[in-house]
């Protein structure tokens, strides 16, 4: 019996082995066939450049998203450029961008960061810059459950209500005390937004903090500079070694000193804020803050990772909503007829009552204003570079493993084949028979697509939507003389280079 039992086991093993080998060969054959099909596709068109430096001199405008968009009119929606010794494939249409973000995601899910961003993100310790792995899934789940998801945003509603009431109060005070004098809209809105960011992160606003590592007490404005302004400045700092990786062994001391100083100051301030929060017993702060959530739900994270993840929520809240709201008010002030139409729509919905979040779905024209502003002034004109870790295809072209890929959101939103008069700000393009469609949220690509879609889309929509609505409901906005030409942006971002200066007149209740 033992002999026959052994024979039976051996026979089963042999049969299983043959089955495994058969299917493995089939799988290998299928894989090779697919790879063969990919490799026979044409190569991505190449933008002519110079020896050694490639196309770097052609990017001297320092606004690559605009240069990339102009090139797309010549070379098509997908092309390759040389950044020093590195090749970069640039995508400039919604179709190719969605293909990379959704259809080919499994082949292009890795981030490729500049030397500056590698330091400032603590080597991809942020949700937005981490590779799509277990760490990313954990921290994004925490971000949605603890702060940016639908349920979490309901819990944070009182922060948004206080934000718009404070902004409204300060604007009314300016109109009363300095009638017909331009108001610096950014100074007011930015200050209040930063307060909301701190409350969500630490449970309370912070007017000043003693930073032991720096030996100084910083005011709220100084905290903002360290945590937001300096980081935006550092993110676009250029290290020539990014373009010539084979020379990375050569020191670039001035660059390294600048970035490390910003990074260390940011961590020092974050550590001070975290320690201050941990000392609170709940009497002065809201226990439902993101720091508490991370510390209780993600115990595998290091202290530095927690600091960076909490900081990420601050910069996202304080920056994205500001960019969109400021540009929307600028365009509304520039186009009085659009402003009047929006004001009438809000009046028809609210009557004499204040506009509220619950009414956002009832104002399609306001939603058109919001999405058209996102289209023309996307807060992130360029998506952080991605890396193809295997051969794939995009737009009918072969993309070899090792390719670096840049998605030009600005170019997608200025594509003349997709958008009528893309250079014009025209909210009506988002209206379908006078109705707002929820799918409009993804038409502009401003929040990305697929598994890496921006976690902050809901918060940005709520904050900017209610802010724009209330500001137009309560004030008539006009640009000061010369303000219409103030359209320059800061570095690689869409933020206005100069703060919006407008003349406001309170509307009658």
Curated annotation (Swiss-Prot):
Cited CDD domains: CYP77_89
Cited Pfam families: p450
Side Cytoplasmic, residues: 24-509
Biological or metabolic pathway of the protein: Plant hormone biosynthesis; gibberellin biosynthesis
Required co-factors: heme
Subcellular localization, as worded in the UniProt entry: Plastid, Chloroplast outer membrane
Tissue: Widely expressed. Highly expressed in influorescence tissues. In germinating seeds, it is mainly localized in the cortex and endodermis of embryo axis.
Membrane topology listed for this record: Single-pass membrane protein
EC number: 1.14.14.86
Function summary: Catalyzes three successive oxidations of the 4-methyl group of ent-kaurene giving kaurenoic acid, a key step in gibberellins (GAs) biosynthesis. GAs, which are involved many processes, including stem elongation, play a central role in plant development.
PANTHER family for the chain: ENT-KAURENE OXIDASE, CHLOROPLASTIC (PTHR47283:SF1)
Protein name: Ent-kaurene oxidase, chloroplastic
Provenance organism: Arabidopsis thaliana (Mouse-ear cress)
Gene name, Swiss-Prot/TrEMBL: KO
């Amino acid at each position: 019996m033992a002999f026959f039992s052994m024979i039976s086991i051996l026979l089963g093993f042999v049969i299983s082995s043959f089955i495994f080998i058969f299917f493995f060969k089939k799988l290998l054959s299928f894989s090779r066939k697919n790879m063969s099909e990919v490799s026979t596709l044409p190569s991505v068109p190449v933008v002519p450049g110079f020896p050694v430096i490639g196309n770097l001199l052609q990017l001297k405008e320092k606004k690559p998203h605009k240069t990339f968009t102009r090139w797309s009119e010549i070379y098509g929606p997908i092309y390759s450029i040389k950044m020093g010794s590195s090749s970069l494939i640039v995508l400039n249409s919604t179709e190719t961008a969605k293909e990379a973000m959704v259809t080919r995601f499994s082949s292009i899910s890795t981030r490729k960061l500049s030397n500056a961003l590698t330091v400032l993100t603590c080597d991809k310790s942020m949700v937005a810059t981490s590779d799509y792995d277990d760490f990313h899934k954990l921290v994004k789940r925490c971000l949605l459950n603890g702060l940016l998801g639908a349920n979490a945003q309901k819990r944070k509603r009182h922060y948004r209500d206080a934000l718009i009431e404070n902004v409204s109060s300060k604007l009314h005070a300016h109109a009363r005390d300095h009638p017909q004098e331009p108001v610096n809209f950014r100074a007011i809105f930015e200050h209040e937004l930063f307060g909301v960011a701190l409350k969500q992160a630490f449970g309370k606003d912070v007017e000043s903090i003693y930073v032991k590592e720096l030996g100084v007490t910083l005011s709220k404005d100084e905290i903002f500079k360290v945590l937001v302004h300096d980081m935006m400045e550092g993110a676009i700092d250029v290290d020539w070694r990014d373009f010539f990786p084979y020379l990375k062994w050569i020191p670039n001391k001035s660059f390294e000193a600048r970035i490390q100083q910003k990074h260390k100051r940011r961590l020092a301030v974050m550590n001070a804020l975290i320690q201050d929060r941990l000392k609170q017993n709940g009497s002065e702060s809201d226990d439902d803050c993101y720091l508490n959530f991370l510390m209780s739900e993600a115990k595998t994270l290091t202290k530095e990772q927690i600091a960076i993840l909490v900081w990420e929520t601050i910069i996202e809240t304080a920056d994205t909503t500001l960019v969109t709201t400021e540009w929307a008010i600028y365009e509304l002030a520039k186009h009085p007829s659009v402003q009047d139409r929006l004001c009438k729509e809000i009046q028809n919905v609210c009557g004499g009552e204040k506009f509220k979040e619950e009414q956002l779905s009832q104002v399609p024209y306001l939603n058109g204003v919001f999405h058209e502003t996102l289209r023309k002034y996307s807060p992130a004109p360029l998506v952080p570079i991605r890396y193809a870790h295997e051969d794939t295809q995009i737009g009918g072209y072969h993309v070899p493993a090792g390719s670096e890929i840049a998605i030009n959101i600005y170019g997608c939103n200025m594509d003349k084949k997709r958008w009528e008069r893309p250079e014009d700000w025209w909210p009506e393009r988002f209206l379908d028979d006078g109705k707002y469609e929820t799918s409009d949220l993804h038409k502009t690509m401003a929040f990305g697509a697929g598994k890496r879609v921006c976690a902050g889309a809901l918060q940005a929509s709520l904050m900017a939507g209610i802010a724009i609505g209330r500001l137009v409901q309560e004030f008539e906005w006009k640009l000061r003389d010369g303000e219409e030409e103030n359209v320059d942006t800061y570095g690689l971002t869409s933020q206005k280079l100069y703060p919006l200066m407008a003349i406001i007149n309170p509307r009658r209740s």
